[in-house]
Amino acid sequence: MDRIFNMDNKFFTFMSRVADLIILNLLFLLCCIPIVTIGPAVTALYYVTMKMVRNEESYIARSFFKSFKENFKQGVAIWMMALVLILLEFMDFFIMKQLSGGIYTVVKYGLLVIALLLAMILQYVFPLLAKFYNTVKNTLRNALLMSLRHLPYTILMLLINIAPIIAMLLNTMIFSYGILAYFLLGFSTLAFANSFFLVKIFDKYIPQDENAEEEKDADDWTIEGLREELETSSEGAASDDTAASADQEVTEDDTTEQ
């Protein structure tokens, strides 16, 4: 009987996690209402879910608003740039319908490639902003580099995000329940699922010095290996030009973990 009501058993642990995801989802939706704040909201969402994956989370609301406040300016800047590009993509797709023949095909596939690259960058840019201190420019560059270097994980995360939407569009009943699920815990659950891959990826860029880990708080770590990791990402598989390109994309200043 004691095991049933033990707060450490799997059932209570699971229900506690579900409750946290519901609270986090509601906070995320609340902060997305002004539209312009979607960037900081996504950043804060991933800040909390990555801590959940590491079992480092404390108070959900406190952690969420801490990241929301700290990354507000950069989050808004990145989101507004992304929003402009998304709107331009939609406009181009409408204009494309007026074309015909070979030009139509070239433009169509060109826009699809751009849309895919944008989706890949957005998959990483806000989690990167949540995890590391850097400039907007370098955060965007590193998001592109990581999305290409870790392409299998990138594709998997995109599929995780897209699959529920496709299922909802194919079935009206799924659509109805899907809308409810998204409002209840959909966004936080997807971010939580993606965070398992993101934590694994980001750990490659965090020094594993045990002494440093004991002496410093995680928020104070400096990413010493970011440049080296990106420079050698193509070793044995890609050309020297790719590695040189990665060297140019990373800043001379170290990136610092938040």
Show where each model-derived region lies.
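Helix-coil boundary and N-terminal low-complexity module in membrane systems
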Residues: 1-111, 121-124, 128-258
